[in-house]
């Protein structure tokens, strides 16, 4: 891997790996090698959830479990992680197989989000829980400062449904129009039909649920509710 690109990435992350094979594995999609990042992603997902939950618990001592859960979901969802990945310019560092490269996998939100979680898992194994916790808090500082409890933290499908119900309009319909990839690494494309919008809204994700949420979020933006 290009050492200039990797050094720039580590500066953006705010962390330098002692064991570079962990960084290489974290950046490797399963389409590129049998030594890929899915186990690190599994580990990083759990660590991220703990760190964000702990931060919210101490920042909002009077907020109930439901609002804290919704805030955590907002902070750890795929499109938030993909935003962070783009801030790190992570796409140009990914190791992808030829098929994923050809189809633009370095731009795909699900791959970017999964890689951020894999990096978290890699940093943990390379250091300790205190180091990775502080690193995550650094990455999330602005988002943690800006987030607040309330209806805004409900998931997009719920907010879209409540908006339409409040205006006595039909509920949105979601239709799977395409499923790409093998069973272990699929991408779903959903069309969401919403009253008041002339064309179906498109959402993609690594599961049907995630694709529906992405479509609902896009619909909310088009309705100028975001």
UniProtKB/Swiss-Prot annotation:
Residue numbers annotated as active site: 45, 117
Family (UniProt): Belongs to the ribonuclease III family.
Cellular compartment(s): Cytoplasm
Cofactor(s) the protein needs: Mg(2+)
UniProt keyword annotation of Cytoplasm present: yes
Chief location: cytoplasm
Protein name: Ribonuclease 3
Function: Digests double-stranded RNA. Involved in the processing of primary rRNA transcript to yield the immediate precursors to the large and small rRNAs (23S and 16S). Processes some mRNAs, and tRNAs when they are encoded in the rRNA operon. Processes pre-crRNA and tracrRNA of type II CRISPR loci if present in the organism.
Gene label: rnc
RNase III domain location: 6-128
EC number: 3.1.26.3
Enzyme's top EC category: hydrolase
A GO biological process held by the record: regulation of gene expression
PANTHER family on file: RIBONUCLEASE 3, RIBONUCLEASE III
GO CC annotation, single: cytoplasm
Catalytic activity entry: Endonucleolytic cleavage to 5'-phosphomonoester
Top-rank taxon: Bacteria
Lipoprotein listed as a keyword: no
Cross-referenced PROSITE patterns: DS_RBD (PS50137), RNASE_3_1 (PS00517), RNASE_3_2 (PS50142)
Key words, A-Z: Cytoplasm, Endonuclease, Hydrolase, Magnesium, Metal-binding, mRNA processing, Nuclease, RNA-binding, rRNA processing, rRNA-binding, tRNA processing
